[in-house]
Amino acid sequence: GEAANVMGAPK
């Protein structure tokens, strides 16, 4: 899992 994914960062 990526921390950015938890933050909901735009891709």
Swiss-Prot record:
GO BP annotation list: photosynthesis
Major subcellular location class: plastid
Cell compartment(s), UniProt: Plastid, Chloroplast thylakoid membrane
UniProt similarity note: Belongs to the PsbP family.
Function summary: May be involved in the regulation of photosystem II.
Miscellaneous comment as given in the Swiss-Prot or TrEMBL entry: On the 2D-gel the determined pI of this protein is: 7.1, its MW is: 22.1 kDa.
Species whose genome carries this gene: Pinus strobus (Eastern white pine)
Protein name: Putative oxygen-evolving enhancer protein 2
A GO term from the CC aspect: chloroplast thylakoid membrane
Keywords: Chloroplast, Membrane, Photosynthesis, Photosystem II, Plastid, Thylakoid
